[in-house]
Curated annotation (Swiss-Prot):
Pfam families: Thioredoxin. Disulfide bonds join 32-35. The lineage of its organism: Eukaryota, Metazoa, Chordata, Craniata, Vertebrata. The active site is at residues 32, 35. This is Thioredoxin. The modification S-nitrosocysteine is found at residues 62, 69, 73. One of its GO terms (molecular function) is protein-disulfide reductase activity. It is found in: Nucleus; Cytoplasm; Secreted. Keywords: Acetylation, Activator, Cytoplasm, Disulfide bond, Electron transport, Nucleus, Redox-active center, S-nitrosylation, Secreted, Transcription, Transcription regulation, Transport. The modification N6-acetyllysine is found at residues 3, 39, 94. The record marks 26 as: Deprotonates C-terminal active site Cys. GO terms for cellular component: cytoplasm; extracellular region; nucleus. It comes from the Eukaryota. The gene is TXN. Homodimer; disulfide-linked. Interacts with TXNIP through the redox-active site. Interacts with MAP3K5 and CASP3. Interacts with APEX1; the interaction stimulates the FOS/JUN AP-1 DNA-binding activity in a redox-dependent manner. It comes from Equus caballus.
Amino acid sequence: MVKQIESKSAFQEALNSAGEKLVVVDFSATWCGPCKMIKPFFHSLSEKYSNVVFLEVDVDDCQDVAAECEVKCMPTFQFFKKGQKVDEFSGANKEKLEATIKGLI
């Protein structure tokens, strides 16, 4: 399951409550074509990797979160462990997304 983040406090709470689990954050926008293309794959990964926390942040709805995380383009995927960012990449690259998850869990 992918959790939609609607505020900066909800983002912090999601990172904190994840504990030791890997957190994968998809920063996207409704008007972004590549974001729409990879979204179903991102959701399928959330079912495949049930021990990983998947979050979605709409950069237009949560500009403060996007700014704090220094998101420059969409989609951007950021990976967190224990509240700290451990990896990041931009672009709708399905293979890289799954490989990064596998490498971090």
